[in-house]
Regions:
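Conserved redox-active cysteine motifs that mediate thiol-disulfide chemistry
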Residues: 80-90
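N-terminal secretory signal peptides
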Residues: 1-22, 29-34
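N-terminal "domain-start" segment that seeds a small globular fold
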Residues: 44-64
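C-terminal segment of classical bacterial N-terminal signal peptides
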Residues: 35-40
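Soluble periplasmic/extracytoplasmic beta-strand elements of cell-envelope proteins
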Residues: 73-76, 103-107, 197-199
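Cysteine-centric redox/oxidoreductase cores and disulfide-bonded domains
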Residues: 110-195, 199-228
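Short active-site neighborhood of thiol/selenol oxidoreductases, capturing the structured segment around
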Residues: 68-81
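Conserved helix-turn-beta segment immediately C-terminal to the redox Cys motif
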Residues: 89-108
């Protein structure tokens, strides 16, 4: 699978989900904003559902960046080898700073090879030392080809205890693998074709945005959320 860049405006979620195909495109009946399991999404019910609010927005195994108490959530599906993910990172971070009220949920979706998988696993393991955001920032800022030794070196230079991260990865391999599986299931269920891909409030965004475009979709998501109240 290759990365996917789509500059089109995001597609809003509508309130009429009748088919599985609709669920692959949309969050389903405003489900995430309303906290209701999507009608036609994968899974059986409630929190076991791949596209439930709990699974997508509030996975307890994924630390939250940005404003943890924000009123709008951005979920980013990314790969550390994705050039578009790297390129848009400053745009996204500036948009978050501009707004100040956005939760950012970073979902590793390593689709570009073994180096991506290793990097994602290692970064997820850094949460046990409270360094997930710092580790993510270090690797998403790479401007060279990602390798396993390079990932370790980059993390060490960012102040991460890499030896501990490796031990934590080994001790929590099953749980970390499960996180990546959940992320993969969700991204595929949303119909994303590559990275970067986003859920912004109730909008599906299959591609990179500029700072201004992020600001616009955040504003649109906030307006849509208010209409639901």
């Amino acid at each position: 699978m290759t990365t996917h860049l789509d500059s089109r405006r995001p597609s809003p979620v509508i309130d009429d989900v009748r088919t599985r195909r609709s669920a692959l495109r949309l969050l389903g009946a405003g489900a995430l904003m309303a906290g209701i399991t999507p009608v036609a999404a994968i899974g059986q019910s409630n929190d076991d559902n791949v596209l439930s609010e709990a699974a997508v927005l509030r996975d307890p195994d994924i630390p939250v960046a940005g404003n943890a108490g924000g009123d709008i959530t951005i979920v980013e599906y990314f790969d550390y080898q994705c050039p578009y993910c790297r390129k848009l990172e400053p745009e996204l971070q500036q948009a978050l700073k501009d707004d100040g009220k956005v939760r950012l949920v970073l979902k590793d979706w390593p689709i570009l090879g073994p180096a991506s998988v290793y990097a994602s696993q290692l970064v997820l393991a850094t949460k046990f030392q409270g360094k997930f955001v710092e580790a993510h920032t270090a690797l998403i800022g790479l401007d060279v080809r990602l390798t396993e030794p390079g990932a370790r070196e980059r993390l060490a230079n960012a102040g991460i205890d890499v030896d501990r991260a490796i031990r934590d990865l080994q001790a929590n391999q099953e749980g970390i693998t499960a996180v990546l599986k959940r992320n993969d299931d969700q991204a595929k269920a949303f119909g994303f074709n590559g990275t970067p891909a986003f859920i912004v409030g109730k909008f599906r965004v299959p591609g990179a945005l500029t700072r201004q475009q992020f600001g616009q979709v955040i504003a649109d998501a906030r307006k849509a959320a208010k209409k639901k109240k």
